[in-house]
Design a protein with these regions (language model features):
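A short, Lys/Arg-enriched interface patch at domain edges and termini
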Residues: 47-71
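Structural detector for helix-capping/boundary residues
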Residues: 9, 29, 46-47
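Major-groove DNA-recognition helix of helix-turn-helix-type DNA-binding domains
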Residues: 15-41
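Polyanion-binding surface elements
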Residues: 1-22, 55
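Residue-identity detector for glutamine
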Residues: 3, 21, 35, 41, ...
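Intrinsically disordered, low-complexity regulatory regions of eukaryotic regulatory proteins
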Residues: 28, 43, 66-68
Length: 71
């Protein structure tokens, strides 16, 4: 059975970003997540990460089509 939820550490590995960047994505609401357990650890549903990646592809495509290669 595939893993449904990812830790922020998993997200950093998947996206090759820092822990601070992953936390900022969650805090801003750009990457939906939930807090679980007594220590409030963040979990990101795999489908939400995939949706985020698809949104980033779409944004990148739009920038390229607009001639904005510097992002």
């Amino acid at each position: 059975m595939p893993q449904r939820f990812l830790t922020l550490a998993d997200v950093t590995d998947e996206l090759n970003i820092s822990a601070a960047q992953a936390y900022a994505l969650v805090r801003s609401g750009e990457l939906p997540a939930i807090q679980v357990g007594g220590r409030g650890q963040w979990r990101v549903e795999m489908s939400e990460l995939e949706a985020y990646i698809q949104r980033m592809y779409a944004q990148t495509r739009q920038r390229i089509e607009a001639g904005d290669f510097d992002g």
